[in-house]
Amino acid sequence: MSNERYNARESEPKWQAKWDEAKIFATRNDDPRPKYYVLEMFPYPSGRIHMGHVRNYTMGDVVARTMRARGHNVLHPMGWDAFGLPAENAAIERKVAPKAWTYANIAAMKKQLQTMGLSLDWAREFATCDPTYYKHQQKMFLDFLKAGLAERETRKLNWDPVDMTVLANEQVIDGRGWRSGAVVEQREMNQWVFKITRYAQELLDALETLDRWPDKVRLMQRNWIGRSEGLLVRFALDSATTPAGETELKIFTTRPDTLFGAKFMAIAADHPLAQAAAAKDPKIAAFVEDCKKRGTAQAEIDTAEKLGIDTGIRALHPFDPNWQIPVYVANFVLMEYGTGAIFGCPAHDQRDLDFVNKYQLGNTPVVCPEGQDPSSFVITDEAYDGDGRLINSRFLDGMSIAEAKEDVAKRLETATLGNAPVGERKVNFRLRDWGISRQRYWGCPIPVIHCEVCGVVPVPDKDLPVVLPEDVSFDKPGNALDHHPTWKHTACPQCGAKATRETDTMDTFVDSSWYFARFTDPWNENAPTTPDVVNRMLPVDQYIGGVEHAILHLLYSRFFTRAMKATGHVGLDEPFRGMFTQGMVVHETYRKADGMFASPAEVAIVAEGDGRRATLLDDGTPIEIGPIEKMSKSKRNTVDPDDIIGSYGADTARWFMLSDSPPDRDVIWSEEGVKGASRFVQRLWRMINDAAEIAKAAPAARPDAFGPEALAVRKAAHGALDKVLSGIERLAFNVSLAHIREFSNSLGEALARPGAASPDVAPDLAWAIREGAVILVQLFHPMMPHLAEECWAALGQPGLVSEALWPQIERDLLLEDSITLPVQVNGKKRGEVTVARDANNPEIEAAVLALDAVRQALDGKPVRKVIVVPQRIVNVVG
């Protein structure tokens, strides 16, 4: 065996320079080969890449390199999702301009990514904060505006009075701003929205076509869109208890079958009826104000205590005008969902049951499980939401749920209240239009001008881009664009009067909703896309990113692609053909006696009995080994990719990230695992060098025949080719790596055989070893490209392995020498027989009739005939 060590520090920069010089990863848009577009979600330039980036981008690179070797014109670009609040926070905390901070981070992270050896087309690189990028985003905004897909509307929004900005629902925690801690106010504000709801049904239906997306992601989007079929019911209000002018209360329900179980109505705090009641009762007014201070995120509403206050208003049951139902203002009803009002049937909804138990409103079960005695069926603390038959429901009694729903719908459709039907079948969606206005500086400016004469005026195309000013100050809270002395002041493009620019900027999700399309031709200065190019290169064949983006980013991108199609920028509906969500990189946590966390670099781990013990490196103080958690700065359980690449090399880091666990699951970072990957790198290097020596004795031409030893090597090599490729195509990278290890063991055994390293080695074996070594290098090239290039050169192969085509698999070599066939006697399986693959019928018959199971089944009866279905089955007829 060769004793020369592989030196990653020397090898990796050398090959990266050669790739760059040869421009082998640059993609030509006019390349006639079939295209393959692989894309990992582009990063936010925070300043440092982390191990999650290493895993994510390594996966994409394996796919890109493999598809390139398979003869495709691969597009594998990289850019930067560069707008966002962290840059403004840095400006406030570090007194550095957002632009300078962002571009410095981009430079640092690009350098880090380049050390990984990724096969990226850096010529297509852009940042979303480049005016040359957001110019086209502004153009599309104006196109959407013309098409009615962008509108300005008044919405109730979460307003942080200290930071002076709108907060998303998820940023309101216990009624306070996540950053300032200030009590959040509900304000009606003008907001720019994209009309995603126009595509709600289409976005839902098209999920069925995305068969290369994870089921969990499709389910999350399906639930977020939230289609529900139900009935819009108009409840008359009792005039004696209702404020003047209010006559009815509309609710949308998916369970009209449970109307006879209604015990209360609940309305949102900002429902007009609640406002009318609050105007007359200080207690109701105080409760309404308290509701407005609470978070409106669904997760917070689901977990908060369900509270309400009786308005004194009474609604009349649609089937019984003498049945009055109390109307409550409740903290779990939101105005933006449905009609902002519900009816509560506590026996069959847990939230409603918790509510009535708190306020002692009682419950009446109206659906009884099959087989249960209706007279004894009661509900106490647990609602029943299963199937059954209707009870306590007058004319609905005995019906199934489906029958009762239909009966109620028909009756209420024909009943009237005023001049309109009491009931109307409706389809409702949970999805709401996408509010894109943000009161921030570091975002894409919204290209409209506000004129007192003309109103809202689009910025003319010739004046795009509307560029952010750089001389901004963050000394005051709120949006720096509002405080700028000159930027927002302009002239109206239509009448020339004094006017002001829109100072809201776009949600950063807009920036990432079309970047994949821009990558197809980022040099086009005149339009967001080049139609013939974008329609040829899209959709993205394989998109890779975290499951945390399953809803917003992926759903917004699906909408945006449709909006781009409607405005002539693309010719397709779905942006991503295949979607893969990788697991996280996790690590143990280490906690010191004072409760503070220690980083892995500060800790020594030693085995102790059946367990392990951790101490601080600097003074030997024992510390607690905590749970394995996602790498995070707060837990200090991060590992710096630069340290790993500097110590072991990029290929070792890449290999470890792929080898230890299925790619859709979390990978546990361990120093021992990395060391094991490093040892494997060295083993491969020695093995290929030994094979290169033997290959010198190989004939140039393929031998006419191969002996058993050579044939075994060739079978192992071509079997690995087939299995490794299959694993990569299924994104089962850990499976592919296991097959590479398996084949390396087979090749290692061949190299270790007596005589293999001899000058007199058999020509057929030398040829097979050379072929096997070349195949092995091509197999691990997508995962460890630097080592592969070094090994490729050691084997004397021409050019770069990064440009080599995938070897042709010889299918004959995948066939086993023997085959196992099921054996039936008179049509009933009795056993199996293993015979040579090329055995003839008489040989198969003899082997079958010699089986004890066959003789026992025949029980002395003569054999009438033996039917052999080649390569399939044998049937004995007795």
Curated annotation (Swiss-Prot):
Record EC number = 6.1.1.4
PROSITE patterns the UniProt entry points to: AA_TRNA_LIGASE_I
Q: What keywords would UniProt list here?
A: Aminoacyl-tRNA synthetase, ATP-binding, Cytoplasm, Ligase, Nucleotide-binding, Protein biosynthesis
> Which InterPro entries does UniProt cross-reference here?
aa-tRNA-synth_I_CS, aa-tRNA-synth_Ia, Leu-tRNA-ligase, Leu_tRNA-synth_edit, M/V/L/I-tRNA-synth_anticd-bd, Methionyl/Leucyl_tRNA_Synth, Rossmann-like_a/b/a_fold, tRNAsynth_Ia_anticodon-bd
Name the gene: leuS
Indicate which residues the UniProt annotation says bind ATP: 633
Query: What are the record's GO terms for cellular component?
Result: cytosol
Report the subcellular localization.
Answer: Cytoplasm
Q: Where does this chain carry the motif 'KMSKS' region?
A: 630-634
Magnesium as UniProt keyword: no
Catalyzed reaction equations:
tRNA(Leu) + L-leucine + ATP = L-leucyl-tRNA(Leu) + AMP + diphosphate
- GO molecular function per UniProt: aminoacyl-tRNA deacylase activity; ATP binding; leucine-tRNA ligase activity
Question: According to the UniProt entry, where does the motif 'HIGH' region sit in this chain?
Answer: 43-53
Task: Return any one Pfam family short name.
Answer: tRNA-synt_1g
Q: Which family does it belong to?
A: Belongs to the class-I aminoacyl-tRNA synthetase family.
Which BP terms in the Gene Ontology apply to this protein?
A: leucyl-tRNA aminoacylation
Secreted: is it a keyword of this entry? no
Recorded protein name is Leucine--tRNA ligase
